[in-house]
């Protein structure tokens, strides 16, 4: 599977009269190993400086369900746009206490086995780190972005954006194992021609997996 792409909206007039471009983004670590669950976002290059605007976000919000099974959150990282909702489902045989200290959206749910929380609306852009107050190794990240195009990489470290208009773009990458409180990695001014298929690579320096070496401070986004 080539990643689960969440396209936040494409302005139809940008694509009119031109064949769409395609951009494949691959993310690896410094050893060249593929990095899954990296969030890739794309915006128009220098949109504000040039007086232009990014394509508007799609109007209909969606509901995402994060499962808890085998003492793990699935998916580990999920991508949202502002206005989307999230619900947590407990598919385990034990109780979970789902919580976040994030200033963007602090919350907590105590979920008995087989129970799904009420949907919770995510209004602000940013990253929300979520844990279980009973099982410290359980960690989940909600990435809320108003970028026109956003997706997370698959297990091969790859995501493909199709139907992009011709133009210049800034491509950003974020992953939970990057050092916290630092900006996303970015490659600016990536130019795509109509009908062009292009590949772009990012190599990340990553911290140890916090699900295996839990650090409560690392979750405070």
Predicted regions and their residues:
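N-terminal signal peptide c-region/cleavage motif recognized by signal peptidases
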Residues: 15-17
């Amino acid at each position: 599977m080539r990643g689960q792409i969440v396209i936040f909206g494409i302005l139809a007039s940008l694509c009119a009269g031109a064949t769409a471009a395609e951009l494949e983004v691959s993310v690896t670590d410094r050893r060249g190993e593929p990095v899954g669950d990296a969030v890739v976002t794309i915006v128009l290059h220098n949109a504000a400086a040039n007086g232009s605007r990014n394509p508007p976000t799609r109007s209909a919000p969606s509901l995402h369900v994060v499962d808890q099974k085998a003492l793990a959150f699935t998916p580990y990282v999920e991508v949202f746009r502002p206005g989307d909702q999230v619900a947590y489902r407990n598919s385990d045989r034990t109780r979970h206490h789902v919580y976040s200290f994030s200033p963007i959206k602090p919350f907590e749910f105590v979920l008995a086995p087989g129970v799904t929380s009420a949907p919770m609306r995510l209004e602000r852009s940013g990253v929300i780190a979520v844990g279980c107050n009973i099982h410290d190794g359980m960690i989940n990240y909600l990435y809320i972005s108003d970028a026109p195009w956003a997706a997370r990489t698959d297990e091969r470290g790859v995501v493909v954006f199709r139907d992009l208009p011709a133009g210049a773009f800034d491509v950003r990458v974020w992953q939970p194992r990057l050092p916290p409180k630092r900006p996303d990695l970015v490659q600016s001014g990536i130019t795509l021609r109509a009908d062009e298929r292009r590949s772009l690579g990012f190599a990340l320096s990553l911290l140890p997996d916090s699900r295996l070496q839990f650090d409560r401070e690392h979750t405070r986004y």
